Amino acid sequence: MSHPDLFSLSGARALVTGASRGIGLTLAKGLARYGAEVVLNGRNAESLDSAQSGFEAEGLKASTAVFDVTDQDAVIDGVAAIERDMGPIDILINNAGIQRRAPLEEFSRKDWDDLMSTNVNAVFFVGQAVARHMIPRGRGKIVNICSVQSELARPGIAPYTATKGAVKNLTKGMATDWGRHGLQINGLAPGYFATEMTERLVADEEFTDWLCKRTPAGRWGQVEELVGAAVFLSSRASSFVNGQVLMVDGGITVSL
């Protein structure tokens, strides 16, 4: 096996949730550049169509699958439709996620429930639905998008931190249950990246100054810097890697 083949995704089909923008869209494009046939998932058809047009403008191809990852029945039906109409899902990037910020003592039940529904329940719903098809085939890659917030806490985002801690340990549980069937399930944990979700923090000079001093790399991450890790975890290069969470964080989790 040559070195390029080790990381090639040619012939593999990848479902990426929350793929209409941000990290999900960037990872989807990255997988496509390494040869994967990408299926973009989201709840909004117009947003997905726009994302698909962006693929075509860059000479890439993608299909779309509109369903709500927080609705288990919709997930089961959506995954089944992809398998039936497009072909087997070889790679799942469980990316869909949201953020809510407020002091913990003021945090609303609705915001708590929304976070749990999107950040935790959806990872289980989509992971389970896809794994049910992967297991009989004896192969498959699942990459759950985690966060450094599973290891670090900051004021105002305690519930988000709780959801990402849950995803980290759900990843380990998935690997324990499904590894025996030939699946590899791992996590990719971004540090502080400049995305739509972090626009307010990027614009906050005081926070950015603190972050750059706190991070050995001395800067915000750029979303394209997540692609290499995603390709590794999606490819044959990680065939004996299971239940791990790969931190892509510029070193912030190892620095005091």
Curated annotation (Swiss-Prot):
Q: Which superkingdom?
A: Bacteria
The cellular location(s) given in this protein's UniProt record come to: Cytoplasm
| Noted pH dependence of activity | Optimum pH is 10.0 for gluconate oxidation. Optimum pH is 5.0 for 5-ketogluconate reduction.
The record's function comment reads: Catalyzes the reversible NADP-dependent oxidation of gluconate to 5-ketogluconate. Is involved in the non-phosphorylative, ketogenic oxidation of glucose. Is almost inactive with NAD as cosubstrate. Displays high substrate specificity since D-Glucose, D-sorbitol, and D-mannitol are not oxidized by the enzyme, and 2-ketogluconate and L-sorbose are not reduced. Can accept D-fructose as a substrate, with a rate that is only 10% of the rate of 5-ketogluconate reduction.
State the family named in the UniProt similarity comment for this chain. Answer: Belongs to the short-chain dehydrogenases/reductases (SDR) family.
Q: Which NCBIfam families match?
A: PRK07523.1
Please give the subunit comment from the record: Homodimer.
Q: Which PANTHER family match?
A: 2-DEHYDRO-3-DEOXY-D-GLUCONATE 5-DEHYDROGENASE (PTHR42760:SF5), SHORT-CHAIN DEHYDROGENASES/REDUCTASES FAMILY MEMBER (PTHR42760)
Name used for this protein in its record:
Gluconate 5-dehydrogenase
User: What organism does the UniProt record list as the source?
Assistant: Gluconobacter oxydans (strain 621H)
Tell me the name of the encoding gene: gno
